Curated annotation (Swiss-Prot):
K(+) binds at residues 336, 338, 341, 511-513. It is an enzyme of class 1 (oxidoreductase). This is Inosine-5'-monophosphate dehydrogenase. Homotetramer. It comes from Mycobacterium leprae (strain TN).
């Protein structure tokens, strides 16, 4: 028997206790016919089935503290995480999410080296001090330097000799008017002596050197002149521009990445750790599985607390308990709620998301393990409901897929802009394209399919309206969450988790949306269904 399994009686007891929190309006779920009163375990509720009850409040929405735990050891200033989907999160989205106060999770539907390279891109995008800066040699060509700068989106490189000693620096200004790209760096670079800083320099002292000498890059060297780091003026500017940014102890942006349980899963995980990833998500459609539990446990033994490990996805209390027992630092909840997911229709399996969150929290809460609500979130109010149900953070797919930072293809239809968006269980995600292999199949335990025309998809491909920059979308989502905290008298997410729901009827849902009027101007945070 899989560890962490609980009996239906235990599950029913919890549901009965949760009825009170949901308004006490539920009929006896056992009265469903047949001889087994526990055959139907519970009534499943999702976001459209409930509303948060307003409460006495002295909370001004703008002052509410929306920070929350992502994992046992990582706290986000904004409880939003972008989904590990190939039309949602690559390096550009991960950088933007971290700067906004959340975090991005890089998808795994690409070769191992490319995913690790995207981790490096995020980690190098800004830092208090780059401790392992990209460098070049004096005998490199300008073409080689240009390729490195383009790959890492940087404007120049320190030049070091074979011993690692600083020999000079080369920047865009040095190369801008050079036509011959076969020239060596030594012919063009600014040679030593350069303005440098000693190891251990403080941020204030480094900023002073940059200002006084009107330079943009400050190499850090040891007592023997060997390069040990690089400080750039852009990092100080970025810190001022993005005060909520989620960073590690070295001032670098936080980033997560998804791994599976298939053939290359362990190699992928170790390469991501070496690249500097902060969070690994063992990302499958059904985490209450021996392969997933063993992978979570093995990762925790190997890397300890150096990298946080999240397990998912689950929809039951027993599954969440199994992940907690395996050592997961957070549990991701959601079997079939996503807009592009067809698992509940194809397999007939799943649990409505509010109930799934409540069940997972019952197992994770006493253990101090945060819950991540993944999927089914259509409006900012759904984020508030997910957190009120006990989740600590939310993972977003469709809400972010239409942003400029999402990697989906931009499409024009009848003069309107859309972006492609697909589930990771869709045929497009699970089938290879040309010489490109799909790495998504094992998420649905379908990597043993004899041929791609034998795949059984659990997702669809579609498009979502183009929403513009991520920052605008995040502003609206955070604004809705803050409004909910004001209405419920919740100064923190932890207090919001104690808010009470009321169950509503289909008529109540209809009343909740705009009605009896024709919309003439679109609101930035409401999209008719």
């Amino acid at each position: 028997m899989i560890r962490g399994m609980s009996n239906l009686k235990e599950s029913s007891d919890f549901v009965a206790s949760s009825y009170v929190r949901l308004g006490g309006l539920m009929d006896d779920p056992a009265a469903t016919g047949g001889d087994n009163p526990h055959k139907v375990a519970m009534l499943g509720l999702t976001f459209d089935d409930v509303l948060l009850l307003p409460a006495a409040s002295d909370v001004v929405p703008a002052t509410a503290d929306i920070s929350s735990q992502l994992t046992k050891k990582i706290r986000l200033k904004v409880p939003l995480v972008s989904s590990a989907m190939d039309t949602v999160t690559e390096a550009r989205m991960a950088i933007a999410m971290a700067r906004a106060g959340g975090m991005g999770v890089l998808h795994r539907n690409l070769p191992v080296g490319e995913q690790a390279g995207q981790v490096e891109t995020v980690k190098r995008s800004e830092a208090g001090m780059v401790t392992d800066p990209v460098t070049c040699r004096p005998d490199n060509t300008l073409a080689q330097v240009g390729a490195l700068c383009a790959r890492f989106r940087i404007s120049g490189l320190p030049v070091v000799d074979d011993s690692g000693a600083l020999a000079g620096i080369i920047t865009n200004r040095d190369m801008r008017f050079e036509v011959d790209q076969s020239k060596q760096v030594a012919e063009v670079m600014t040679k030593t002596p350069l303005i440098t800083a000693a190891e251990g320099v403080s941020a204030d002292a480094a900023l002073g050197l940059l200002r006084r000498n009107k330079i943009e890059k400050l190499p850090v060297v040891d007592g023997h002149g060997r390069l040990t780091g690089l400080i750039t003026v852009k990092d100080f500017v970025k810190t001022e521009q993005h005060p909520l940014a989620t960073k590690d102890n070295d001032g670098r942006l936080l980033v997560g990445a998804a791994v599976g349980v298939g053939g290359d899963a362990w190699v992928r995980a170790m390469m991501l750790v070496d690249a500097g990833v902060d969070v690994l998500i063992v990302d499958t459609a059904h985490a209450h599985n021996r392969l997933v539990l063993d992978m979570v446990g093995k990762l925790k033994v190997e890397i300890g607390d150096r990298v946080q490990v999240i397990g998912g996805n689950v929809a039951t209390r027993s599954a969440a308990a199994a992940l907690v027992e395996a050592g997961a630092d957070a549990v991701k909840v959601g079997v079939g709620p996503g807009s592009t997911c067809t698992t509940r229709v194809v397999a007939g399996v799943g649990a409505p998301q509010i109930t799934a969150i409540l069940e997972a929290v019952a197992a994770c809460g006493p253990a101090g393990v945060p819950v991540i609500a993944d999927g089914g979130l259509q409006y900012s109010g759904d984020i508030a409901k997910a957190l009120a149900a006990g989740a600590s953070t939310t993972m977003l797919g469709s809400l972010l897929a239409g942003t400029a930072e999402a990697p989906g293809e931009l499409i024009f239809v009848n003069g309107k802009q859309f972006k492609s968006y697909r589930g990771m269980g869709s045929l497009g995600a699970m089938q290879g394209r040309g010489g490109d292999k799909s790495y998504s199949k094992d998420r649905y335990f379908a990597d043993d399919a004899l041929s791609e025309d034998k795949l059984v998809p659990e997702g669809i491909e579609g498009r979502v309206p183009f929403r513009g920059p991520l920052s605008s979308v995040i502003h609206q989502l955070v604004g809705g969450l803050r409004a909910a905290m004001g209405y419920t008298g919740s100064p923190t997410i932890e207090v919001l988790q104690q808010a009470q729901f009321v169950r509503i009827t289909p008529a109540g849902l209809k009343e909740s949306h705009p009605h009896d009027v024709a919309m003439t101007v679109e609101a930035p945070n409401y999209y008719p269904r």
